[in-house]
Amino acid sequence: MLNYISVICLAKLERRRNSDDEIDVEIDLGAGMPKYPLELNDNILWVGTMNEDETTKSLSDKVLDRGNLLSFPRPKEFISRAKANSVEAASMLPKNVWQSWLDANVIEEEQFISRIDKYKKGLEAVNEAMEFAGRALGHRVWQSIENYMANHPKVIAAIQAESFDAGVCDLAMQEAFEEALVHKVMPKLRGIETDGETKTQCIDKIESVLFGPNGKDGLAPGLQADFEHAKKNAYETFIWSSAKYLEIEE
């Protein structure tokens, strides 16, 4: 149900972007009252949170493509809580802080432009390999990955540093690319068979792009342990269900 609501809201927001017509969403007020039409002006954003874990069904590609996702590794040590204390509400975000985040985007910076092309070509190679399994990536996936990398705090810090360090910048962009792959590409590989021709023509080719032909010089080496884990399960299909790459960053 939550997935359905998410898709409906996203569809209306997309219509708002491409149309001058009045777009509204009907709010159920209860008590037998008529539904209240809320016009989706430019000053209205749809914000909500939900967990995707073993208690929920998988979210659709549409929701994953347009959502902002957070991944967490499994806890290595459990923390006790004797008493559940109430959490104070966070203060409102000042507009100037929000604007500073928008202004920090480095997508037009030369150091970013000169490094992003190899990731674009790599993702195109992944897309080509996915064709054998009847899967594909669209323009939106690449655009979201590119913008994710351009807005990543580590990438921004590396490019805007007073003393630019190419090695630090390269590592920051690699980590940002890895995070974006987990959120935008790995869900699209779910269910692909990990044996037979599908393995050799799809999974193995993707693996070669991400980790290199001999396990070296790939675009996303930090994801190798998770990728191996996704291939090895009783169903013999690709299922991404771990976050070991976050433990590496720690």
PLM feature spans:
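C-terminal regulatory/interaction module of P-loop NTP-utilizing enzymes
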Residues: 1-250
